[in-house]
Amino acid sequence: MKSKIHHQPNGSNNGVVSSNDNGCRSESPSPPLSPNRRVLRRQRRQTLLRASSFSLRRNLRYLLLLPMIYASGLLMCVGPFSGLVGWVYVPGSVYRSPEIYRKLKDDIFSDNSTALELSSVWKFKRRPKMPKPCPNSTVSSHFGLNRESSALAPSSGYLIVEANGGLNQQRSAICNAVAVAGLLNAVLVIPRFEFHAIWKDSSNFGDIYDEDHFISSLEGYVKIVRDVPDEIMTRFSYNVSSIPTIRVQAWATVNYYNGEVYPVLKEHGVIRITPFANRLAMSVPPYIQLLRCIANYKALKFSSPISTLAEKLVDRMVEKSSATGGKYVSVHLRFEEDMVAFSCCLYEGGRAEKSEMDVIRQKSWKGKFKRRDRVIRPDLNRVNGKCPLTPLEVGMMLRGMGFDNNTSIYLASGRIYQPEKHLAPLQEMFPRLYTKESLATPEELAPFQGYSSRMAALDYTVSLLSEVFVTTQGGNFPHFLMGHRRFLFGGHAKTVIPDKPKLVLLLQDMEMRWEVFKKEMKLMLGESDRKGVMVPRVRKINRKTSIYTYPLPECECIFHLSSNFSNTGNILSLGALHPSSNLISSARL
């Protein structure tokens, strides 16, 4: 049957398809189009024209909007709008605390109201709840442990981790390493500490923590060794870098370790995980969470040199706080030079201060702060509460809360930026101001000089036993300390957490009266008291908060694990504390 080929009615070939069109020649002309088909084709053509016109208008509208969008983005992201049309003042964006201090100074020092008693600062109590069953039997079944014989099931291999950062970032890595070793049924090699250019501390594990205590405390839960055995190392020519190294994703889940890490460990008998900061999710099974608790609150005890001096510092603070019943306030003040530079905040030093901070940022962090996508807004940093509180601001806040000039304050800090200038107002408001440098002799501190983590361990211990702890800038130190205090003081962090966005607004109001400021500070203290006893809801293994900041309820199970792990014994192993202190004897565990 012959197929029909239709000629193009308006073609230039007079209705003939050429051979170049890959068509076939037809002798008969095409039949004329019916009227209905002509109407349909005309309607289709008009519809296409209308659609094309609409599309053109829409695209043209977008084309006109593009320059406007680009200009808006340029103003918001590349250069502040205030830089083009004149500086726009944002309330709280300028550091005016020295001005208001001078204005209110007479009122502060003439305030005759009753001083806040340190023994009655904290009003809220943790509500007692029905204790949940501890995962004791679960631990036994998962680890194959026998607490009588301290026997463990055959291991899957050796786990090497390298912890970086400062004291408490390393502490987090150690606790996570114990948990991962338990999860993989591995033998954990004493964690290695990486040297960091910022922290500049070459300390090893044994310089900070008691290795023997660490190993013995975890006996029967996770096996700990100091080194990988020779029979393993000979396979890698005694070169640690030749050992299979795994880069684990941040906040890795239990399934990730079982699926990705365990097979490699089983195959080679040893693995190395580096870096190891935040490499385990917070949501883990109860028996893994319990290992974190045991490591943090039982196994990690500061080394003898640190614990010995720390005990002396606590004793001296208690002695100097006789006017307040041996109780004192500790303040974690992050106003060191590098912290001020990193925050990208400006105070009252003008261009000279800005230039100085630019040099420090470039020296310590290279080009991190000069990237094109990095917009530095000191004013917005301050409004959003991201600027470190100055010693003056801390002093005014505490005086407003009701702490008088008889209050003993321990300052946990490195070298303060421009100390002569910035520490003077705080010293004026609180004459009983002490640091580890003022409490210890130069000879006692000599072995610690040049080791930031060892110095931080001293601050950690003295702050841990204070009646009131004040955090000013966040970070691992206060988060770990608040969790440790919750564990130590029956669930209450006993910590002042300033509402910094609110505080900066108050401290730039030149019309504010001292009575108004005091009222706001007492409300802030009350809010810290309320939040201090809050326990996040934990459903099964769905934990979104840090076990190190909120250790309850899981870590309460530590007291049920061993009959010889008594309250007193526990205190002695929590960072080298001692039972003679009034604070320790009054702590409820």
From Swiss-Prot:
Biological processes per GO annotation: fucose metabolic process
Binding-site residues for substrate, renumbered to this chain: 332-334
UniProtKB keywords: Carbohydrate metabolism, Fucose metabolism, Glycoprotein, Glycosyltransferase, Membrane, Signal-anchor, Transferase, Transmembrane, Transmembrane helix
GO terms under cellular component: membrane
Subcellular location: Membrane
InterPro entries: FucosylTrfase_pln, GDP-Fuc_O-FucTrfase
Cystine crosslinks: none
Highest taxon, organism lineage: Eukaryota
Membrane topology classification: Single-pass type II membrane protein
Protein name: O-fucosyltransferase 11
Organism: Arabidopsis thaliana
